[in-house]
Amino acid sequence: MAIFVLRMKDFGMILSGDIGGTNTRLALVDKDDAGQLQLGTLQTYPSRRYQGLHEIVEQYLREHPASVEAACFGCAGPVKNGRCATMNLTWVVDQRELADALGIAHVRVINDLESMAYGVSCLQSKDIEVLNPGAPDAAGHAVVVSPGTGLGEAGMYWDGKQY
């Protein structure tokens, strides 16, 4: 849920992406009349078939034309100043270069596990599998562990109001 970095209230249509060493997943996200997030068509692309993220985004937008106001991509690898040397790929994903190449004014690149951590607050009880029953603290800290091409983790600190 990389889109939370951009605050949906500030934008209309947002392109959201999960950029991994094996696959890249893109989807458009918009709000319905009640202000609830609506996920558009989710498309998966084999990352290694492309020279860079911009090629995949261009293909996605040809297949799913939309007026995108902002984009946020969770990338597998360390991110510093909006730039990620992706793990298991030869790509460098840079938010300024993407903004220029795609003509999207607001582009953010964050770590993929940071992106997942933002999405934790959107989960409902039906989305959660309890591994170790106990008495959870509903307003406590949270952690995300994600096995994939690599193993990622992210922690979330609850400050009493938000993560």
What are these regions (language model features)?
Residues 64-109, 114-127, 144:
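Short beta-strand-loop/turn "lid" adjacent to the catalytic site in phosphate-handling enzymes
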